Every structure is written in C-alpha cells, then in structure tokens.
Amino acid sequence: LSLDKLRENLSFNNIFYKDESRRFHLKSFKALGGAYAVEKISKGKKNMVISSATAGNHGRSVAWGAKRLNLKCKIFVSQYVSQTRVHEIEKFGAEVIKVKGNYENSLEECKRLSKKNNWQIVQDVSTKNYKYIPQLTMAGYSIMIKEISKQTDH
C-alpha cells in the first residue's frame, strides 16, 4: 500500500505499508513468526505438545501453527488478557490457561508446567540459554521482508 500523502509531507521518496492482518486469518502482524517456529521444531514429532506465554498476537500464531500440524497446544495468558484475545487463540484449538498476575507470571507458569510435562515452549523472546526458537520466530518474520522486497522492487 503506497502512502503518497505522508511521503510528500515528510519529503521521502517512498513510504509503503504492508497489511498483515489477513494472513492465515489471524488478524495479527505476528502471524508468521510463531507458526514458522512450530513447524520447524516439530518435524517428525507427532506427539509434541507446544506451549507459549502471550498477551495475544504471538499466541495466535503459535496456536494456528500447532493446529495446522495437529499438535496439542497450551497457551498461557495473564488474567488481564481480554476474553476477545482468549477466544481468538481458542478458535485455533489451543487450550488457554489463565494465570493470576501479569505477562511475566504467565511466562513463569508456562516454563514451570512445560518442564514438568515435557512440553515444547515456543517464545519469541530470547534469553541467555534460550535462543534457537526465537531465532526461528525471527526467520518466520523475515518472509515478510522477502515479500516486501519483491512487491516494491527493492
């Protein structure tokens, strides 16, 4: 989508906007990342259970990716996440687990139960000892960059 008026006002050569809201019917700019990571880590693992903590967008992508591959999925959310966002995740077959407290509390509970139950965590944020899956998530986002490059001849 070209933004000619804004481009003129800012004196830029070009400004483009890429609408990701319709990809996979996820209504999210994060549609590619989590789903891509789920696909890459689950190859040949039919009984894998995927888990993630989210405030909404990443969880939808992870849930969609798990559903597409017929994998069970557990998504942890804070008690403050809206019921609308919970429903958007549940419609892709994930079990949503509400956790008392904020996002960090939901992440800690996700880690605790995932370790206890041998579930595979798919988070988009790296830490000192957790880099591979966030890198896969970023690789999923890079698909958009390739598309933008083709669509804009840049």
Mark where each language-model region is.
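PLP-dependent amino-acid enzyme catalytic core
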Residues: L1-H154
